[in-house]
């Protein structure tokens, strides 16, 4: 069980169990390859890497997954989905995602736990490398470089008007 606080300071106790994993699958949908919604299965070993990758780039998905996992606790606190999600932003999303990832490792049966832990560690390393590269590229930018103008340049006096010029042969 992992604890984190939302942006309102409310504490949440997250435990990934078969019941909470089933709630996530039943309550959260993501776009499938065909564009149609498909259940988000956080603990399916075949798609775990893809699921974690989706969570790491979608704060709203993190909030929805946490809501589904914590639904009984949310209800016990007299909150609805909107109130819960209103408390999920910034650092609380980061804390919730960290708790969720740690719970995925704990949830996984022992014989596969090392594999899941290694997967998450490798994803952390890759994300750090990619982030450092993006920061390096941003710092290497020069003012005005790569900025596309949306306006046309001012008309030049040497640009001829439409139609034949004085040097054009007569028809």
What are these regions (language model features)?
Residues 1-20:
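Short, extreme N-terminal segment that most often corresponds to the first beta-strand
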Residues 1-7, 26, 33-54, 60, ...:
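Charged interaction scaffolds used for protein-protein
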Residues 13, 54-55:
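Generic alpha-helical structural element
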Residues 16, 57-58:
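A generic short alpha-helical patch detector that favors 3-5-residue windows
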Residues 22-28:
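Covalent nucleotidyltransferase core used to form phosphodiester bonds in nucleic acids
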């Amino acid at each position: 069980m992992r604890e984190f606080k939302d942006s309102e300071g409310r504490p949440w106790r997250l435990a990934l169990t078969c019941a909470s994993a089933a709630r996530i699958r039943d309550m959260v949908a993501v776009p499938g390859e065909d564009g149609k919604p498909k259940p988000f299965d956080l603990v399916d070993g075949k798609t775990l890497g893809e699921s974690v990758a989706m969570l790491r780039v979608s704060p709203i998905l993190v909030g929805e997954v946490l809501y589904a996992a914590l639904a009984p606790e949310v209800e016990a606190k007299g909150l609805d989905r909107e109130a819960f999600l209103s408390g999920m932003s910034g650092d609380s999303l980061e804390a919730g995602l960290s708790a969720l990832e740690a719970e995925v490792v704990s949830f996984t049966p022992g014989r596969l736990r090392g594999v899941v832990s290694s997967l998450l560690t490798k994803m952390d390393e890759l994300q750090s490398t990619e982030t450092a590269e993006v920061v390096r590229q941003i710092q290497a930018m020069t003012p005005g470089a790569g900025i596309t103008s949306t306006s046309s340049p001012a008309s030049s006096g040497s640009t001829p008007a439409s139609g034949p010029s004085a040097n054009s042969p007569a028809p």
